[in-house]
Design a protein with these regions (language model features):
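Sequence-structural signature of the catalytic-core scaffold of metal-dependent phosphohydrolases
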Residues: 20, 25-40, 58-84, 103-107, ...
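Active-site flanking loop/helix segments enriched in acidic
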Residues: 82-88, 92-102, 106-128, 212
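Alpha-helical scaffolds flanking conserved acidic
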Residues: 94-95, 144-157, 200-205, 223-224
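A short glycine/small-residue-enriched secondary-structure motif
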Residues: 103-119, 144-150, 155-170
Length: 224
């Protein structure tokens, strides 16, 4: 069982400090500047092929054209408990995916064996399981024309808050929680709450277990 993803006692993040570090790091590169791009190597030759930046607004418009009729569009989504300014480049679901990927709750999954250990096999943890689920789910979502970023966010976050030792931990922890312990509900409502994720992402995480109501998005259905 995980505590919230970030402690309130953790030091505040200074964007200016990160920018300064990025500039200092770029100056250690042996490359050169060309059309506003810093190349890492002195003999770099391959750029992006274009200096045109595809921002979030244009990418959301492409989603509207390319995704399947019932797929979840990023435009108009992004309903968070605490309202936030939209990112210039990333969609709301890409931001969710990134937050989960960098969260301490996600990294702690590495210390939890999924079920039990086979001495002759590699250990499978909740972290490796989440990565495998994300790989399969995004492949399916891409083939079906669904929102891949939302699918990946749900898949990566679906076991955050899970107890150790498989689902037996739910039985062990349930007596201590009035409504009983369900790792999916606990993950969405407690462990990941500090990340301020979108409602669609939390719904997919909360309802990925078959004992729960069906998710409200096709992306959530793919993960479950």
């Amino acid at each position: 069982m995980n505590t919230p993803a970030h402690s309130s006692n953790s030091p505040s993040h200074d964007p200016g400090e990160s920018h300064s570090r990025a500039i200092a790091w770029a100056q250690t590169m042996h490359g050169f500047d060309s059309e506003g791009i810093r190349f890492a190597h002195a003999d770099s030759w391959a750029g992006a092929g274009s200096t045109n930046i595809i921002d979030r607004v244009e990418r959301e418009a492409r989603e509207h054209e390319l995704l399947a009729p019932l797929a979840t569009r990023s435009f108009g989504a992004g309903n968070r408990v605490i309202a936030e300014e939209e990112d210039t480049f990333r969609t709301c679901f890409e931001r969710d995916r990134d937050r989960i990927l960098h969260a301490s709750a996600f990294r702690r999954l590495a210390g939890k064996t999924q079920v039990f250990v086979f001495p002759q096999d590699h250990q499978r943890t909740r972290l490796t399981h989440a990565l495998e689920v994300a790989q399969v789910a995004t492949a399916v979502a891409r083939a079906l024309g669904l929102n891949v970023a939302l699918t990946e966010a749900i898949a990566l976050g679906h076991d955050c808050g899970h107890g150790p030792g498989g689902h037996a931990s739910e039985d062990a922890l349930s007596p201590f929680i009035p409504e009983g312990f369900d790792h999916a509900v606990w993950g969405a409502n407690v462990t990941l709450v500090s990340l301020n994720l979108c409602a669609e992402t939390l719904d997919g995480i909360r309802n990925h277990s078959w004992s729960r109501p069906a998710p409200q998005t096709p992306e959530g259905e793919v993960v479950s």
